[in-house]
Design a protein with these regions (language model features):
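Noncatalytic, typically N-terminal accessory segments of nucleic acid-processing enzymes
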Residues: 1-260
């Protein structure tokens, strides 16, 4: 979706898709070179999601089409820059098939990126991208106990998923850009800048605070982090709507932690 916003107006859908696919490959290449891993790279795209999530996605896509149409009619001008149907970014579509083929070919040669191995999991494989990554971590626990892992992604649930795996991989960090509206949330952050989120440090501070500022032992630290993740489910995630009385934008987290 970020790559779509970088492409100017167009008239030819086929040409647009080719430009988009090349842009995606180039952006992934840029991130690999920027982070500079020396062993493995895992590139994961969303495959078919669980049924509950599929229903949510379907509703969201229908709504976005109707909203765009209404917006154009109200303003009496074509304010939607691109008319390409973003529903094509769905497992099983012709576009995703083309993207999968290109990704597999483009990243076939790991030597080009100075790494030992590049693993690709495209939309042809079931499961959401982030879940594929963490499944790989769980299946290779010995390796991740002593290695540093950097995960790039914009989904908010990556923070919770990474916290949840700290007991398996104690040195995990999130790499992400800030969106253009970040100033409305935190004035200290700059839009479109790259940031590394130190998840081990976050987990350490979190477990200390939830343990009444008493240094937790290993079991307590693990349990406090799990408690925090569970409590945050009340604020909603990809699979659950937020609890009606709580909202993350209106001191929801502070309220929950105060009660805890």
């Amino acid at each position: 979706y970020d790559s779509i916003r970088e492409i100017d107006n167009f008239t030819d859908n086929d040409n647009f898709e080719n430009i988009l696919i090349n842009l995606i490959c180039n952006k992934i290449s840029f991130y690999i070179k920027l982070i500079s891993p020396d062993t493995n790279v895992f590139i994961a795209f969303d495959g078919v999601a669980p049924v509950a999530k599929l229903e949510q996605q379907r509703n969201r896509r229908y709504k976005s089409v109707f909203e765009a149409d209404i917006l154009n009619k109200l303003t009496k001008q074509d304010i939607i820059k691109n008319n390409w149907n973003t529903s094509a970014i769905t497992p099983g579509t012709k576009f995703m098939s083309k993207l999968s083929d290109k990704i597999n070919k483009f990243f076939k040669n790991s030597n080009k990126f100075n790494v030992k191995k590049i693993i690709t999991s495209t939309s042809n494989e079931i499961g959401e991208g982030e879940h594929k990554i963490y499944e790989f971590i769980r299946n290779n626990q010995e390796y991740h106990k002593t290695s540093t892992t950097v995960i790039y992604g914009l989904d908010a649930d990556l923070i919770m998923l990474t916290l949840n795996h700290l007991h398996i991989a104690p040195s995990m960090f999130l790499f992400r850009e800030t969106p253009h509206f970040i100033k409305t949330i935190d004035k200290t952050l700059e839009p479109n800048k790259n940031y590394i989120i130190d998840i081990p440090l976050f987990g350490k501070v979190l477990s200390l605070e939830l343990n009444n500022n008493k240094e937790p032992d290993t079991k307590q630290k693990k349990n406090r982090i799990f408690d925090y993740i569970f409590l945050c489910f009340l604020l909603g995630n990809d699979f659950l709507p937020h609890f009606p009385a709580l909202n993350i934008r209106t001191t929801g987290i502070d309220t929950i932690l105060c009660v805890y």
